[in-house]
Amino acid sequence: MNKKRKPLELYVHIPFCIRKCAYCDFVSGPGTKAMQKEYEEALLAEIDAAEEAAESEVISVFFGGGTPSAVDAGMLVRVMEKLRSKYVFSEDAEITLEANPGTLDEEKLKCYRKSGFNRISIGCQSVHDEELKRLGRIHTFAEFQESFALARDAGFANINVDLMSGLPEQSEEKWEESLRTIAELSPEHISAYSLIVEPGTPFAEQKLDLPDEDTEREMYARTAEILAEYGFFQYEISNYAKPGFACRHNIGYWKRTDYLGFGPSAASLFGNCRWTNTADRSLYLKACGALEKIREDEEILSRQDAMEEFMFLGLRMTQGISTAEFEEQFGKEIHAVYGGVLKKYEAMHLLQEHSGRLALTRDGISVSNVILADFLL
């Protein structure tokens, strides 16, 4: 009888885009064809060199960036071929590609489908062209609509659309209009993030007219209400899906499934080992697969580290965490470890326990950052 393989997720970083957006702090930027070719060689060498997970089964792959759809489709096809030759894939593995409007065409999409991509995540951010311009996006809303239609025509039956609230000069009415317009297109999944102005980005240097905290809270509360009207359920702080279409890759992160990340700045968790790849692209290219030069911040997680992650990642999901699973993993009853914190937030009606699960309430979700920080021992 075959031994059951452990589930594994793979993340592939493609650090190229047409132009960096004003709010982006990811390791990304424009790249020439020669740079992309050099990067592909280094990426394939890293995948070849990785020794972990020979006994695992890949349940999801996520190509992020940057903008993976901005590079030659052949690169992504070759990387997928390399991954399939190295790892065992489950029959129904979820394989996602991040894409931006203005970088997709019929040929590329056919290529993606042929190589096994079955989910596409398209960055829209807003249906208002003036908001897109402020964000430094390369596309209009009309171009997003065209890309969405092309993806459907190419056979993508699982499409996510990214939206952003809390934008400069954004009103509640404009946010609601973005939500309803996208929901009416009927994607399977919507990710609705609040803008965070990160240090070192162009936005950080500007004096922005941002919505106040009360307006942002109202925008957040309305998001779940509006999307529910269109058949979307909230399964995580920023994610909404039609039944059966919650992103399995994201859920894997929140449940601490093993994952390996390839490319500069990519993070990995395998067993109780965690590491992050160098964010220095030139160093990554020179290393050409030498893992000792690529991997940084390697650490062995203690049981306490793992407990903390179990709580603050698991409680991001609306279904919360299983108290029995906590005890099974750590050999301790959850109230013996976190009793004080649990009582505090249950008394404030921000956390609830029901049928062996602990989850944030609707009010708890809106102040989740404060609550989750309290689970650090």
Task: Please report, for each region that a protein language model flagged, where it lies by residue.
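C-terminal scaffold of the Radical SAM
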Residues: 5-7, 28-52, 56-332
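Short amphipathic alpha-helical interaction segments
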Residues: 331-344
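Short, amphipathic alpha-helical interaction segments positioned at domain boundaries
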Residues: 363-377
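Minor-groove-contacting beta-hairpin "wing" of winged helix-turn-helix DNA-binding domains
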Residues: 357-361
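Local cysteine-cluster metal-coordination motifs and their immediate loop/turn environment
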Residues: 15-26
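A short, conserved structural fragment
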Residues: 346-356
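Immediate flanking context of iron-sulfur cluster ligation sites
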Residues: 4-14
